């Protein structure tokens, strides 16, 4: 049995099949009606709509045949796509190309075959519409050939209808993301270069709030209003809807110098709130710009992700619009890698360890306690600073498990020190998610019972940013912590609002002066005045004052003279492993 050859345009033909997604669709009633009409007209027991990929033929619809696919080498339709007209086989048992075919020798025992190519406007034959009989027949009459070609054209019309439906965003009636991706591919092949612009109108959090409070229909209507604004400002551009809050448009090669002008017009369109059902919604627009060239674009590169990344960058920096920035994208990719690895590390407890930085009583030099600090050695990236991974964790649900890990291991270490008669006060940093409810405190109480630890040896350190989410809820948790005997310290005091009012309203026991107070303290009279005043006022209010970042003897002596209670910093000691800390204490 001969193997059917591939047409000269096989690569383009296969690419078109892939673009249409014809192999992924389910049953279609229109296809089945066309086949029913074909079998009725030609009086055949079998009719098929077949689409060919590189190795197989797939039946998008069939009558008289139960199978969904066959190898391409066994396909009659693989010959039908080689020409422009109807392909006929009067008796397959007499044709050397087919007489040994398994579908001739066995079921469905094909004898007569006639197939009309399913041709695109570009002349690419995607497959065929064929009729099959189990008995030999003579050649089709001219009118019958014309009718078979007519049925094939009906199939192609339906394919294009399905294609159009698949490429439309239903709420807005605009072309969707799939159509944008196809248009980019086709225009790059034709013109060699273009620019993609993504307009993100609302942060996802704001969209979720709108949906939660006003409903999905309102959010759809809001996007319709936004669509109309863009159309009014840029009537000559094809607009695409590429996500719930994002629109896209293309600048052809000859208009790429107009990029800035187009972006400014888009931003101007949303200077005033979008009024939907009488409710004004202020858009927070970020525009991403990505020039593309056919000779530089990596075939595996997700350019849509890149232009969306640029839009997010523009909004985050408050600049309106921004071109794609590879270093920033690499940073975002690294952040994603870290978050993925962080989740795995929490589950396996691999790569984490704690170090402890001493605090001393400034008047006497005696060590009063330690601060537990988390360290992470990534298996591929090496040491990752907590200044990098903790802010990432705080934006996700990983922060609570991470805090629990620190609490669990720090209290276990404190228990070991207690057993060796090394009494220390342990400070642990807590995040906003730790303060949302009492579960973190409940875990601390459970661990204290397990390790026989007095909770008065535990101090919770939080930054002023913790209060931004829900100051009332945080206050309740802190009050409960204080009732349990824990110390409460405001960390990095001076970097936020430094609001003395919340100090009055919360059960604070200590404030930790940020190292911005102590940096270059000896050389700045103004810094000295501010720092001395803060120490004096905090002391009068009954707070223990701890200075961070002490690195010079001059700073140490100034703070000591002004009545600062405690200090920590590299002059005193760097963060250490438990055994190193014990050696330091003995010295």
From Swiss-Prot:
Reactions this protein catalyses: 3',3'-c-di-GMP + H2O = 5'-phosphoguanylyl(3'->5')guanosine + H(+)
Disulfide-bond pairs as recorded: none
Keywords noted in UniProt: c-di-GMP, Hydrolase
GO CC annotation terms, alphabetical: plasma membrane
Comment, domains: The EAL domain contains a functional active site loop (loop 6), which plays crucial roles in stabilizing the overall protein structure and participating in catalysis, and also controls c-di-GMP and Mg(2+) ion binding.
Gene Ontology MF annotations: cyclic-guanylate-specific phosphodiesterase activity
Enzyme Commission number(s) from the entry: 3.1.4.52
Induction: Expression is significantly repressed by azithromycin in a time- and dose-dependent manner. Expression is also affected by clarithromycin or erythromycin, but not by josamycin or oleandmycin.
Protein name: Cyclic di-GMP phosphodiesterase PA2567
Ranges where the EAL domain occurs: 335-587
Biological process annotations from GO: regulation of single-species biofilm formation
Keyword Nuclease attributed: no
Domain of life according to the entry: Bacteria
Knockout or disruption consequences: Deletion of the gene affects both virulence factors and the quorum-sensing system, and significantly decreases total bacteria in a mouse pneumonia model compared to the wild-type strain.
Domain GAF: 28-157
Lineage: Bacteria, Pseudomonadati, Pseudomonadota, Gammaproteobacteria, Pseudomonadales
């Amino acid at each position: 049995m001969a193997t059917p050859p591939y047409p000269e345009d096989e690569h383009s033909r296969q690419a078109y099949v892939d673009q249409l997604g014809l192999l992924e669709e389910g049953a279609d009633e229109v296809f089945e009606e066309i086949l029913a009409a074909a079998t009725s007209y030609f009086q055949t027991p079998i009719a098929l709509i077949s689409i060919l990929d590189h190795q197989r033929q797939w039946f998008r619809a069939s009558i008289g045949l139960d199978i969904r696919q066959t190898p391409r080498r066994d396909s009659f339709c693989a010959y039908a796509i080689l020409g422009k007209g109807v392909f006929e086989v009067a008796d397959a048992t007499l044709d050397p190309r087919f007489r040994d075919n398994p579908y001739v020798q066995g079921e469905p025992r094909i004898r007569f075959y006639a197939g009309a190519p399913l041709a695109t406007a570009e002349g690419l034959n995607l497959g065929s519409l064929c009729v099959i009989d189990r008995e030999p027949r003579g050649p089709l009459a001219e009118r019958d050939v014309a009718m078979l070609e007519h049925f094939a054209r009906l199939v192609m019309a339906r394919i294009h209808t399905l294609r159009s439906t698949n490429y439309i965003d239903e709420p807005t009636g605009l072309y969707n993301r799939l159509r944008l991706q196809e248009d980019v591919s086709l225009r790059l092949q034709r013109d060699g270069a273009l620019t993609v612009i993504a307009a993100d109108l609302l942060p996802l959090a704001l969209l979720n709030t709108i949906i939660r409070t006003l409903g999905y229909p309102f959010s759809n209507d809001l996007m319709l209003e936004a669509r109309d604004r863009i159309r009014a400002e840029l009537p000559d551009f094809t607009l695409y809807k590429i996500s719930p809050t994002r629109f896209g448009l293309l600048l052809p090669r000859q208009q790429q110098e107009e990029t800035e002008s187009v972006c400014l017009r888009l931003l101007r369109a949303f200077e005033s709130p979008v009024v939907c059902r009488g409710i004004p919604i202020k858009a927070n627009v970020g525009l991403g710009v990505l020039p593309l060239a056919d000779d530089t674009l990596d075939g595996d590169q997700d350019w849509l992700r890149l232009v969306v990344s640029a839009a997010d960058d523009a909004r985050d920096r408050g600049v309106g619009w921004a071109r794609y920035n590879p270093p920033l994208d690499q940073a975002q990719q690294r952040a994603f890698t870290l978050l993925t690895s962080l989740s795995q590390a929490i589950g396996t407890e691999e790569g984490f360890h704690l170090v402890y930085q001493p605090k001393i009583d400034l008047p006497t030099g005696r060590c009063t306690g330690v601060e537990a600090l988390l360290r992470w050695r990534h298996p591929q990236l090496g040491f990752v600073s907590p200044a990098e991974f903790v802010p990432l964790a705080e934006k996700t649900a990983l922060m609570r498990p991470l805090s629990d890990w620190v609490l669990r291991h720090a209290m276990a270490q404190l228990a070991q020190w207690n057993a060796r008669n090394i009494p220390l006060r342990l400070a642990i940093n807590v995040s906003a998610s730790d303060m949302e409810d009492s579960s973190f405190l409940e875990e601390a109480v459970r661990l204290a019972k397990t390790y026989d630890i007095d909770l008065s040896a535990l101090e919770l350190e939080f930054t002023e940013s913790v209060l931004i989410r829900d100051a009332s809820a945080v206050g309740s948790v802190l009050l409960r912590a204080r009732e349990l005997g824990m110390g409460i310290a405001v960390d990095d005091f001076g970097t936020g609002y430094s609001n003395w009012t919340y100090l009055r309203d919360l059960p604070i026991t200590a404030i930790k002066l940020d190292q911005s107070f102590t940096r270059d303290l000896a050389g700045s009279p103004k810094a000295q005045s501010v720092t001395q005043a803060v120490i004096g006022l905090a002391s009068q209010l009954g707070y223990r004052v701890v200075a961070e970042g002490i690195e010079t003897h001059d700073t140490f002596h100034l703070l000591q003279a002004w009545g600062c209670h405690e200090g920590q910093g590299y002059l005193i000691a760097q963060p250490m492993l438990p055994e190193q800390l014990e050696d330091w204490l003995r010295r």
